[in-house]
Amino acid sequence: MSQGLAERQTGWRGPESFRRQLGGGPSAAGRARRELTALEADLEGPVLDSVRLLVTELVTNAVRHAGAPAVELAVVVGSRRVHVEVANAGGAFAARPREDGDSGWGLVLIDRLSDDWGVADEPGHQRVWFEIERV
């Protein structure tokens, strides 16, 4: 991983399982879920289910709130943790969990279901990451 957020924020240094450019638009979340099928042999069902849900939320946020014309998904499957990053080429959005209203629950789910997560606003894009224990 080239000086990615994982390395800077969490000390994670491991081989990427994959990195994909998903494009933007309403179908980006579906494309992300299809890409995650590549992990079915490597991840336990409940972990993969959580990763799939949280990736869907992050990709949807990137498209809906940041107006991202393109979204990048990167996943590292380690022996103890799964590290996921979603980067958007749009503007930054307020990445704070909100529990009010009918929408805005994506980051609440990230906060509750992941073991760690964070955000980096970088020139030209925003990167949101999370980690889930495999145990």
Q: Which sequence ranges carry the predicted segments?
A:
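Conserved phosphoacceptor histidine of two-component systems
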Residues: 57, 61
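STAS-typified acidic loop motif
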Residues: 19-31
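Conserved beta-strand-loop-beta-strand hairpin that lines the nucleotide-binding pocket
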Residues: 1-19, 62-135
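Solvent-exposed, flexible loop/coil residues
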Residues: 5, 26, 51
